[in-house]
């Protein structure tokens, strides 16, 4: 592309073409822009490399590389010659064009002239652009390589005088003035405009006007570069600009007034001078100086003339030439070389003074007229002089850097702040003499250039984006305001391009060129630049990174006003002379001044002199050139590719020939075949040996690397293990210290609180041993009275004393916090106007940790008088304990065993507070939904003076109730509308925001195990309620783990029990492992400390210690064997369980295992539990029937109705036939009257004429031969009897026939015709009355056969086969007519036939009148009908098969045992509570109870609250109810069922606390009978092991609460052991010993990727019995639903998910599976048994299974009998 760009300039100028004229501001001129057509492109003259191939071939001895290099050199030389020729041709053409367009003629008269205005030159067009671009030249000189001389740039006087008056001014008569000072070109342009107007007289060619202050454009604004794009328009524009520049330069040079010595007219800036010196090599370019990157310009902006360039000297070329020729006179600013300092006569720019003069002015403090660059140029030399003087005084040592160089002065110029102060003094002092050059144009330019750096802008227009420009606030309020660039508004930016030069000079301030002075800006108040807040981080104007900056928006507004004021001031200055300028003569000059004041139209062109249309044209030209370039590239690429392809082929041929020549020269004429035969054998052996050596080396190094890796890994592993062991030892020691600290702190707190509230005395009872507390003196606490600060607590140190002091202080803080909280609550109650409680016994202030012996000050409470009951001794102690809790302001847990009266004790506490402390509320009681009514009844019964408000029901009802208790600022007294609010847990969570608005005196949580999960929303919501004290009532404080105990303890004392991790570190792991039979490290002293910590907060008594009159509780386990059907299904499940998969699942389901695997395992457990309960839970033996094509209506319960139920009309065919109307109503039926019918004609026509069954017709036809009624004579019937029989119904015919046969049998003669008698059917035959003669005492044969048939299975209804696979009712016609429906019903349902078949109705059987009437209608038919009286074999087979009810009992062993047990209990007068885990099992039991006709009640999670209350009341009051069916979770909480004396658990819970609560519903206070508890357990199944696991959990509770010591309790370590019975375990152990005797070692099973998990094939439908043991979240949701009556417990949530367990699939283990070659099935079983034994024994962790082969999925299909097929 570079060659193509250079080549474009060598072509002759093409023909130009006009385009659309652009808008011009002058109304009389039309402006045409020229655009260049597409230039023709010559193909490049590349020399193909193939042209040199011939010469290469002719010189075989010459190196091809040398030839190719020579070829490339020749090509490069030819290309350079061509470029030089093109450049010379271009320069010649440009000289001719410039000569043809002189400014004297064409510039003035051309109507298409481009408006003149000064704009900065683009960077891309300047000398700093790409140097390969050919620049225009003039007079044979290139501006880049050879700068023009001053004579070429500065016009002569003759050229100046030839400048015409501006054509935009009207002509005026101006007398010639003395030529003292030439006018600026702007004034000349205005005069020329007036001279061209038709009415104006001829004006002299030159008008000399002098302005006091003005600004000039830069002389170096050439628009050069890419002239072939813009063509003639750009050429004329450039010619005009060059002429204007010459005129301005000459005029400015002649305006030098009072110049200083050696002061140049237009000095260079410091940057330009340094740049020239760097080019000339005078100074070295520093390498460590970071230069700021300039902003890159867009090519489109450059071509459109919208790019700006940094300012430069107006005559940069001339000054560059002068600098080059006279460098010794006009030296450049730059760094000082201490070894070779600059001459004092060197000129300093931009001031133009010598270095000596500048230094003298700076030292004298007179820096007027100097800029920052001037001061910077000499500051180093001044600093060195000063340091040299100091060094002379100190011994001649200059300050140097570390590298030995002389240190320079850093920072800005020394006199810069002085300059700012002097400028201010200069501007503010009236009458002070101005600068010597202030009155001249050149002086103005020089001053403006000097002030440009001083008034540099605050914002840098080319600064990096995002870089913050630091600014400095002016020190004095009257300081000089900064100048801003680009501050013109849109009006000034779009002024006409042909406006006078004065306006252009005024607009100069708004561009990125030279910025001069502005009196308007100087006279603005200092407020125009608002002061910054931080002076230390701001910079003064002109000290920024860029030379010119851009002002902010507020500053732009000020500059706009300043520019307008400056314009008016500048114009006004032309009206009269001043002291520093030559005056203008009177007369016409005044008119000129008036014209100068004229306001011109706004500018509408681009600021650079390019209009919008011209910019569009330029943009189109750019696009055309780009398209042309790309088209040339696309055209030339294939050709160049072919050229280089040919060159490549030629080079390949040369290389090939050269190789062939080398081969020929190397071997010569020797016989190559002989050498090959001799070397073949050697090469073959050498190759083999080399391969073997390489293989051995590779093997050696592989082994070596492997050994190194193994050794390195071993060393790293050992180092890691050592580091881990050390870290574990440190962490163990640290945790031990932390545990000791926490225990000490809690012990001190518990010790004091326990003595205050007397927990020990409350627990003491007859027959109960209470351990003496260890005396602990307060001297051990070591808390100083002075309160000196203790050292920081560090658990890594061994300072036990410091730990104990911190623990004591922490306990004291906790006590103080409890005291402050209670006091604050009481103060808030008093502040609301509540009555002061009688706090005679309250000693909150005495709660001092330093005085622990306050036992004598504790409160002794008697029974309240308002309590309408007599408390027992242990209950009164419990009331005293609760009262002391309130007195001390702490919370507690009343954990008495279920049935000891926790409710009455809490009620008595509320009565005590109301009676002794005058605290009538508000109290909040939260209980499960099933006990809400019980609480309401107990409060109304025992404390009628306390008003209880039940808060439950619909949202609307609760909103009404809230109006009662949620009043603001209400006080509570005996007359208050309520005292106690009773609600459930679910409603408390829902209405939390309302309950938080009240401050409750006491909050009582009944059955507090409902908040055992600290992560539940219920726990968090209740913890946030505002209450003074909390009391938790629970019979089982320990549920599943110690985590639940921590949740309760944190709820009552969050200050101490604030971290569950710490609590678990204390006790959880040790106690749980100890109760599980695993060796734990729970020490007796730790257990003792745990009891001591829990004792003050928890009061627990058991029944055997405190209630002597309460009857005993006997628990009996009833072990049953599975039925045949259960055994088959259980065996089928076991066969599909692999022991290997069992162990793998156990290994994967650790605490951090996969939850999906855990869910699969638990689901498999639930399948086994279903089998043990009842096989119908898998698939119910449903009613079986053929496919019926029809619809059925709703019917009753088929199981209850029995086999005699028959609904013939319940079925209806899906096909319906619509009868046309004409067939029934419009004459179709002869017996239906109508308008067009023939009613009455049926008697004549149908009954007589068309009836063949009339007696006359029969009699007539019997006389004819071959007549159809010939049989009448044979059967012995008369024509009348035959006619009557034909017209009678079928049933009447059958009855008459049966009666005739009976008479004939009884009265007729004997006929010896065996064949005829055998062929007669015996259906519906009436038993014979003829006596059968038999031997006396013998049974007749008929009776024997009947009895055998009745006792056989084939006689049963369920054994009779169904003949059809599909049946369909009859298709009934349909007509929309009432009479049609009545007739149809009368025909289908004949009363006579119905009565004969089914007999009389049950209500008419004993009615003599109905019996007599029935005998007349149907003689010899029993009153019960033919079907009930006939044998079962004669009745029609029913298509509906209903399973017998007895099968429901027989198929389940547990239900069969329950059936016999209930018979015994019913006979003994007992009443039974029957508990279940599954609601579907409760449905089956309901059918059984209905079958046995036992009266029962059912309560589960779906029972509403109101029904629960009614059911409990009915059970307690109605002794006729024998069985109460309950779910363990819904019916085992807080209800009193003491009317029962027997409890039966059909299946038991994972959680032993749930079963304990359930059985205590009957064994509680008020029970006078002995309570017997039965558990139905299937022997040898998973249920037996689940029961053992639950009892192991019960031991945790006993260990924690102190009723049992640490001991080994039998518990399986893994759930896997649940699936193996004792026999299998013993057999596995024997096989393991046998395998070990043969040398077998059990393999290590390593997990490999994703295995087929245990129970993957099962349908994850654990709705039946997922009681939440493994899923705490599901259990919590189930509890919530049960409590609120929102649905059944967790097992009911699975309804509808899985229809039957017959579709459950299981993985089938592969037949070919062995972990070791030659290992058989017995060895595998022995190995698995050995591993399982080690797991159960706790000596080894369970091993994972290797990845088994793919398994098939099989489906268990159950047959009609319920057994697997």
Curated annotation (Swiss-Prot):
Domain spans labelled Helicase C-terminal: 1457-1607
Predominant subcellular localization, coarse grouping: nucleus
Assigned EC number: 3.6.4.-
Gene Ontology terms: biological process: DNA repair; DNA-templated transcription; regulation of macromolecule metabolic process
Bias (Basic residues) ranges: 407-419
Biased composition (Low complexity): 304-318
Segments of skewed composition (Polar residues): 17-29
Domain characteristics, as noted in the entry: The DBINO region is involved in binding to DNA.
Name of this protein: Chromatin-remodeling ATPase INO80
The organism of origin for this protein: Cryptococcus neoformans var. neoformans serotype D (strain B-3501A)
């Amino acid at each position: 592309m570079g060659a193509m760009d250079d080549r474009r300039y060598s072509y002759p100028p093409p023909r130009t073409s006009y385009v659309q004229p652009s808008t011009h501001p002058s109304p009389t001129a039309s402006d045409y822009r020229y655009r260049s057509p597409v230039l023709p492109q010559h193909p490049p003259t590349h020399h193909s490399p193939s042209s040199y191939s011939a010469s290469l071939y002719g010189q075989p001895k010459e190196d091809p590389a040398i030839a190719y290099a020579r070829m490339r050199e020749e090509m490069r030389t030819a290309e350079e010659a061509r470029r030089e020729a093109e450049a010379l041709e271009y320069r010649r053409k440009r000289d001719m064009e410039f000569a043809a367009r002189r400014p004297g003629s064409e510039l003035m008269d051309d109507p298409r002239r481009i408006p003149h205005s000064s704009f900065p030159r683009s960077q891309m067009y300047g000398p700093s652009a790409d140097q390969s671009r050919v620049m225009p030249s003039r007079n044979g000189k290139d501006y880049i390589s050879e700068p023009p001389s001053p004579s070429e740039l500065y016009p002569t006087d003759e050229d100046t005088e030839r400048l015409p008056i501006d054509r935009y001014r009207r002509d005026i008569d101006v007398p010639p003035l003395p030529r003292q000072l030439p006018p600026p070109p702007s004034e000349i342009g205005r005069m020329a405009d007036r001279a061209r107007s038709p009415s104006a007289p001829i004006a002299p060619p030159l008008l000399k006007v002098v302005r006091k202050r003005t600004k000039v454009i830069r002389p170096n604004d050439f628009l050069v570069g890419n002239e072939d794009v813009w063509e003639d328009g750009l050429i004329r524009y450039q010619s005009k600009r060059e002429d204007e520049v010459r005129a301005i330069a000459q005029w400015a040079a002649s305006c030098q007034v009072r110049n200083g010595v050696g002061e140049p007219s237009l000095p260079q800036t410091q940057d330009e001078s340094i740049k020239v010196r760097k080019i000339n090599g005078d100074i070295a370019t520093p390498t460590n100086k970071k230069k700021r990157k300039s902003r890159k310009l867009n090519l489109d902006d450059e071509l459109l003339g919208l790019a700006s360039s940094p300012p430069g000297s107006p005559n940069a070329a001339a000054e560059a030439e002068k600098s080059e020729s006279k460098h010794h006179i006009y030296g450049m600013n730059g760094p000082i070389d201490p070894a070779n300092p600059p001459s004092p006569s060197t000129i300093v720019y931009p001031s133009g003074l010598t270095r000596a003069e500048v230094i003298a002015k700076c030292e004298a403090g007179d820096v007027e007229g100097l800029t920052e660059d001037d001061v910077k140029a000499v500051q180093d030399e001044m600093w060195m002089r000063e340091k040299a003087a100091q060094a002379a005084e100190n011994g001649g040592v200059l300050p140097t850097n570390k590298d030995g160089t002389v240190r320079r002065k850093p920072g800005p110029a020394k006199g810069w702040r002085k300059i700012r102060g002097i400028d201010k003094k200069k501007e503010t002092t009236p009458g002070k003499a101005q600068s010597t050059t202030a009155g001249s144009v050149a002086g103005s330019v020089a001053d403006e250039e000097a002030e440009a750096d001083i008034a540099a802008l605050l914002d840098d227009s080319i600064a990096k984006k995002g870089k913050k420009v630091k600014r400095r606030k002016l020190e004095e309020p009257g300081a000089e305001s900064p100048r801003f660039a680009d501050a013109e508004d849109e009006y000034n930016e779009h002024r006409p391009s042909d406006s006078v030069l004065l306006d252009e000079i005024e607009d100069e301030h708004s561009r990125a060129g030279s910025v001069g002075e502005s009196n308007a800006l100087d006279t603005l108040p200092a407020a125009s630049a608002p002061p910054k807040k931080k002076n230390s981080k701001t910079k003064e104007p002109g000290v920024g990174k860029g030379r010119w900056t851009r002002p902010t928006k507020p500053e732009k507004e000020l500059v706009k006003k300043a520019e307008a004021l400056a314009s008016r001031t500048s114009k006004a200055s032309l009206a009269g002379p001043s002291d520093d300028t030559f005056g203008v003569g009177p007369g016409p000059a005044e008119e000129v001044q008036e014209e100068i004041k004229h306001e011109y139209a706004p500018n509408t062109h681009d600021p650079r002199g390019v209009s919008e249309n011209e910019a569009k044209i330029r943009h189109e030209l750019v696009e055309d050139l780009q398209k042309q370039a790309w088209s040339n590239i696309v055209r030339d690429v294939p050709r160049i590719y072919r050229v280089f392809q040919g060159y490549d082929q030629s080079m390949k041929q040369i290389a090939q020939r050269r190789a062939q020549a080398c081969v020929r020269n190397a071997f010569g004429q020797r016989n190559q075949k002989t050498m090959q035969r001799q070397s073949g054998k050697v090469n073959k052996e050498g190759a083999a040996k080399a391969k073997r050596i390489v293989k051995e080396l590779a093997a050696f190094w592989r082994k070596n690397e492997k050994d190194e890796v193994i050794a390195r890994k071993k060393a790293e592993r050992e180092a890691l293990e050592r580091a881990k062991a050390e870290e574990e030892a440190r962490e163990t020691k640290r945790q031990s210290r932390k545990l000791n600290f926490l225990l000490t702190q809690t012990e001190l707190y518990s010790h004091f609180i326990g003595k205050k509230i007397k927990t020990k005395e409350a627990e003491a009872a007859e027959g109960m041993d209470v351990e003496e507390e260890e005396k602990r003196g307060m001297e051990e606490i070591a808390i100083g009275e002075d309160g000196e600060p203790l050292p920081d607590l560090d658990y890594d140190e061994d300072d036990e004393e410091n730990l104990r002091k911190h623990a004591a202080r922490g306990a004291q803080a906790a006590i103080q916090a409890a005291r402050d909280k209670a006091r604050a609550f009481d103060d808030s109650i008093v502040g609301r106007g509540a009555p002061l409680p009688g706090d005679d016994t309250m000693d909150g202030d005495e709660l001092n940790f330093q005085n622990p012996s306050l036992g004598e000050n504790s409160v002794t409470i008697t029974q309240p008088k308002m309590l309408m009951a007599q408390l027992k001794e242990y209950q009164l102690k419990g009331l005293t304990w609760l009262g002391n809790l309130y007195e001390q302001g702490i919370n507690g847990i009343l954990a008495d065993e279920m049935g000891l009266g926790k409710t009455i004790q809490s009620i008595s506490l509320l009565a005590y507070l109301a009676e002794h402390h005058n605290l009538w509320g508000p109290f909040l009681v939260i209980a499960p939904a099933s006990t809400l009514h019980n609480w309401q009844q107990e409060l109304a019964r025992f404390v009628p003076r306390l008003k209880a408000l039940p808060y439950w029901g619909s949202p609307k009802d609760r909103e009404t109730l809230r109006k009662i208790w949620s009043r603001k600022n209400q006080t509570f007294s005996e007359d208050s509308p309520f005292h106690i609010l009773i609600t459930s847990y679910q409603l408390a969570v829902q209405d939390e925001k309302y309950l938080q608005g009240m401050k409750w005196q006491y909050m009582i949580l009944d059955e507090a195990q409902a908040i055992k999960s600290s992560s539940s929303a219920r726990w968090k919501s209740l913890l946030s309620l505002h209450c003074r004290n909390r009391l938790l009532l629970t019979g089982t404080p320990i549920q599943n783990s110690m985590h639940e105990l921590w949740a309760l303890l944190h709820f009552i004392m969050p200050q101490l029990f604030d971290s569950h991790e710490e609590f678990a570190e204390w006790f959880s792991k040790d106690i749980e492992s100890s109760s599980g039979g695993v060796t734990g490290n729970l020490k007796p002293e730790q257990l003792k400390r745990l009891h001591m910590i829990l004792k003050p907060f928890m009061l627990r008594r058991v029944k055997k210690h405190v209630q002597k009159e309460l009857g005993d509780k006997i628990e009996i386990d009833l072990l049953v064997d599975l039925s045949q059907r259960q055994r088959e299904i259980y065996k089928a499940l076991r066969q599909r369980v692999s022991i290997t998969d069992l162990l793998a699942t156990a290994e994967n389901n650790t605490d951090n295992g996969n939850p999906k695997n855990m869910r699969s395992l638990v689901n498999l457990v639930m399948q086994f539990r279903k089998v043990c309960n009842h096989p119908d839970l898998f698939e119910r033996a449903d009613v079986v029937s053929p496919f019926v094509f029809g619809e059925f209506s709703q019917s009753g319960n088929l199981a209850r109705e029995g086999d005699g139920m028959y609904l013939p009309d319940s079925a209806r065919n899906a096909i319906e036939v619509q009868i046309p109307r004409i067939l029934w109503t419009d004459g179709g039926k002869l017996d239906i009257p109508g308008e067009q019918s023939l009613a009455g004609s049926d008697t004549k026509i149908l009954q007589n004429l068309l009836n063949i069954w009339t007696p006359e017709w029969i009699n007539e036809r019997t006389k004819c031969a071959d007549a159809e009624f010939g049989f009448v004579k044979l059967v012995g019937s008369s024509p009348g009897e035959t006619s009557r029989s034909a017209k009678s119904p079928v049933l009447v015919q059958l009855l008459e026939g049966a009666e005739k046969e009976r008479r004939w049998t009884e009265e007729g003669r004997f006929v010896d015709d065996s064949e005829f008698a055998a062929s007669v059917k015996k259906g519906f035959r009436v038993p014979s009355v003829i006596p059968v003669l038999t031997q006396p005492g013998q049974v007749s044969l008929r009776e024997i056969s009947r009895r055998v048939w009745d006792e056989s299975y084939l006689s049963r209804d369920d054994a009779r086969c169904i003949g059809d696979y599909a049946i369909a009712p009859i298709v009934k016609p349909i007509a929309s007519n009432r009479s049609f429906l009545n007739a149809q019903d009368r025909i289908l349902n004949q009363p006579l036939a119905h009565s004969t078949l089914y007999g009389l109705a049950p209500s008419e059987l004993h009615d003599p009148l109905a019996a007599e009437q029935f005998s007349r209608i149907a003689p010899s038919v029993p009153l019960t009908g033919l079907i009930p009286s006939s044998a079962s074999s004669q009745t029609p087979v029913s298509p509906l098969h209903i399973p017998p009810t007895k099968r429901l009992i027989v198929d389940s062993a547990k239900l069969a045992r329950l059936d016999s047990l209930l018979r015994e209990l019913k006979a003994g007068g007992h009443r039974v509570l029957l508990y279940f885990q599954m609601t579907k099992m409760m449905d089956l039991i309901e059918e059984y109870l209905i079958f046995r006709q036992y009266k029962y009640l059912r309560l589960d999670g779906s029972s509403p609250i109101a029904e629960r209350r009614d059911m409990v009341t009915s059970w307690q009051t109605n002794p006729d109810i024998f069985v109460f069916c309950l779910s363990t979770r819904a019916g085992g909480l807080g209800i009193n069922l003491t009317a029962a004396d027997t409890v039966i658990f059909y299946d038991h819970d994972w959680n032993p606390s749930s079963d304990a609560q359930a059985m205590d519903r009957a064994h509680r206070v008020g029970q006078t009978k002995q309570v017997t508890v039965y558990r139905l357990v299937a022997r040898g199944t998973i249920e037996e092991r689940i029961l053992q696991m639950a009892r192991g959990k019960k031991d945790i509770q006993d260990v924690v609460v102190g009723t049992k010591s640490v001991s080994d309790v039998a518990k399986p370590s893994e759930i896997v052991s649940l699936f193996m019975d004792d026999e299998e375990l013993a057999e596995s152990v024997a096989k393991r010993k046998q395998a070990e005797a043969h040398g077998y070692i059990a393999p290590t099973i390593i997990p490999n990727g994703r295995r087929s998990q245990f129970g993957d094939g099962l349908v994850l439908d654990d709705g039946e019995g997922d009681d939440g043991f493994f899923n705490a979240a599901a259990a919590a949701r189930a509890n919530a639903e049960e409590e609120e009556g929102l649905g059944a417990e967790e097992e009911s949530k699975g309804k509808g998910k899985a229809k039957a367990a017959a579709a459950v699939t299981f993985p089938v283990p592969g037949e070919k599976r062995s972990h070791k070659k030659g290992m058989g099935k017995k060895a595998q079983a022995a190995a698995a048994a050995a591993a399982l034994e080690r797991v159960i024994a706790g000596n080894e962790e369970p091993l994972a299974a290797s990845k088994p082969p793919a398994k098939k999925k099989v489906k268990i299909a159950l047959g009609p009998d319920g057994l697997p097929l």
